[in-house]
């Protein structure tokens, strides 16, 4: 289990965010709380400092470009320069940054290469979920690459109606699953729309994962849901190494 106090997600700043931050001091100040910097070297400095504090790290690359080669090169450089600090770390990658819409085959190749690099460095990769319309394509990409890289994780937004079924399926497979409420808009026909219904869906999905063979990774700041996660872990005999939030 990685508590919110000892697990910090830092972002490698992409081009449009960098330009906006350069123009707007307010954006720059806000981003500094979450963004490691514009260059990989900035992320390395932040990672070194936080590692000395005993924190584990997660990285995302905020790129406006859908260039899979650029994503692979940035993440490869990050993992290489982290050296020993990469052990136990995580890199999250968006399907759009892999060029999934342009070429599913190439996206799979790049994701597989990134997984292989991460494995050599003792790190993990998690594939994020983006627009609901792309759900099937993202799941297909995840399943193809996970055949060779079983530690590849997937982010599931609990606001989508179909995610409960997906949680049962992936739970039976012992997958790494990051569970979040979901931030991309979707219609009432395919998603829960009220905050109350979203929260209930998140709890149901969390329960499914906690009672399964999955490695749940809960992404929430809601203290009530965090407390529930602790209760579910205790009830299901889960040790600190078997889930995180």
Name these PLM-found stretches:
Residues 1-245:
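Positively charged, amphipathic and often flexible ligand-engagement surfaces
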């Amino acid at each position: 289990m990685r508590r919110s106090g000892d697990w910090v997600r830092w972002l490698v700043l992409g081009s449009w965010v960098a330009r906006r931050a350069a123009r707007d001091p307010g954006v720059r100040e806000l981003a500094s709380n979450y963004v490691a910097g514009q260059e990989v070297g900035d992320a390395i400095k932040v990672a070194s400092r936080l590692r000395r504090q005993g924190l584990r790290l997660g990285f995302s690359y905020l790129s406006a470009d859908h260039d899979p080669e650029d994503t692979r090169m940035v993440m490869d450089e990050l993992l290489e320069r982290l050296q020993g600090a990469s052990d136990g770390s995580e890199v999250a990658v968006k399907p759009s940054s892999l060029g999934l819409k342009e070429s599913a085959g190439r996206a799979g190749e790049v994701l597989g290469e990134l997984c292989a690099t991460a494995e050599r460095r003792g790190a993990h990769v998690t594939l994020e979920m983006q627009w609901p319309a792309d759900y099937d394509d993202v799941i297909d990409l995840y399943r193809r690459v996970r055949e060779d890289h079983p530690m590849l994780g997937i982010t599931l937004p609990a606001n989508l109606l179909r995610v409960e079924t997906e949680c049962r399926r992936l739970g039976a497979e012992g997958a790494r699953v990051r569970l979040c409420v979901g931030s991309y808009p979707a219609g009432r026909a395919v998603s829960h729309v009220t905050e109350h219904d979203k929260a209930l869906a998140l709890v149901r999905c969390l329960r499914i994962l906690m009672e399964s063979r999955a490695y749940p990774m809960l992404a929430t700041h809601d203290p009530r849901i965090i407390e529930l996660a602790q209760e579910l872990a205790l009830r299901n005999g889960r040790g600190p190494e078997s889930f995180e939030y």
